[in-house]
Regions:
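N-terminal membrane-sensor/transducer module of prokaryotic signaling receptors
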Residues: 1-184
Length: 184
């Protein structure tokens, strides 16, 4: 499989992971018991965020710079809406230390309604994010394979840190220096 094909597959998987995240929040807002720890709170630790910051940003220097900037902003916006939901449903109802031991209180009807309002805003941002992802995918499909090889380090070409360290170590008897002075 080529670098380009692998990247497109990962792009689609990242989009799917984002949709799963939104659906988990939908369950939470609907009042259904959900393991809150399964919903990432940190944008850079979500599966989508990991893909965005670790892989997609390699193309931030090419013609996709503006689209990636929009995707990044929309991703942050989605998490801002989720933080509002989290604060409304989770942190307010955790009950402090004893609440963690005894279980959390159920959110009130007004808290659920407020969370649903925040969820509607989240869905709007998420839809815009998915649309920008489709634009980015179209740009990637139109990008030549050579550009992928240039910008994305293929897994089989990944640098082995041990081998790299061995290659950068001086060979033979080379005088070591510290602050310009020879070291014995």
């Amino acid at each position: 499989m080529t670098t380009k094909e692998t990247f497109i597959i990962r792009l689609r998987k990242a989009r799917t992971q984002h949709l799963k995240w939104v659906n988990q929040i939908k369950l939470l807002v609907s009042g259904i018991a959900v393991d809150k720890s399964s919903i990432p709170v940190n944008p850079s630790e979500s599966p989508f965020g990991i893909w965005l910051y670790d892989e997609a940003m390699a193309f931030a220097t090419s013609n996709s710079k503006n689209v990636l900037k929009e995707i990044d902003l929309l991703h942050a916006e989605c998490f801002e809406h989720y933080f509002k939901i989290y604060h409304t449903l989770v942190s307010k109802n955790s009950g402090g230390f004893l609440g963690g031991l005894l279980g959390s209180k159920k959110p009130s009807a007004s808290e659920l309604m407020l969370a649903q309002k925040f969820y509607a805003e989240l869905v709007e941002s998420s839809d815009a994010l998915i649309n920008r992802m489709r634009v980015f995918e179209s740009q990637m499909l139109a990008t030549c394979e050579a550009k992928f090889d240039e910008l994305v380090l293929a897994p089989e070409e990944a640098v082995d840190p041990v081998r790299l360290r061995a290659e950068t170590q001086p060979k033979g008897n080379v005088q070591r220096m510290y602050r310009g002075q020879p070291v014995e």
